[in-house]
Amino acid sequence: MSQLLVCRMKPYIQPFERTLALAELSALAHSDPVSVDQHTSNPVLFSIPPVVKPAALARHLAYWETIEADKLYFTTQVLRERTVNVVRNGVPTKDIQQLLFADEIGLPNRRCLRYGTHGIHEYRGKFFPQLVRSLINIADVPKRGIVADPMCGSGTTCVEAILGDYQTLGLDMNPLSVMMARAKCSLLAVSPDALASAYEAIRGQLLRPAGRRSAKLIYFESLPARDREYLSEWFSVQVLQDLD
């Protein structure tokens, strides 16, 4: 493997992300990337010496789409991001796994933040997942190393660490944050078949015609008095019945 590797940067990223993109590529390749398309104001093609296997680069890079070597390698990151397009198209769950690897599913043309379990819960001020991945690359975290986040919020850093095959530790004082972070991380270990089965079961229940609503709030009444008082201030009795 003597030819230069040509890496294509995502063309739609922001200036600060371009800086991170070049920094992560430099850290992983152990050399400074050289612009191939210097005639443009915002070049997206950069070459590096073949000191690292293109497949390894493709597994780690956050802000890049492809690596051209003996063949064209798509980065794992961009393949994960394009899964959002499949789900949004309303494809049946039984067909999703096949379509994820189909050529007709295009690459994203804008920033995608909700792939994997990242879209489960919105958290104000959350990290961009790609930012986390690029910083892990720049920090040169060793294989199976520990990535810790002392204020993990909804778990973006922890999820990216797991996706990158690192160990992770997240801390937060907010119980809701802890619950969401655990849910996001735990789901990554669930088999696709089990997840699809659970989804279809829940979907079936939600789409089932509503029966006669019970006036008794069984789950609501099992909550502590403080929680019942709080929920009653926010929701009407009808909504509480629907939630119950």
Residue ranges and their predicted role:
Residues L20-L28:
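Short alpha-helix
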Residues R8-L20:
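Short, surface-exposed ligand-recognition loops at beta-strand->loop->(often short) alpha-helix junctions
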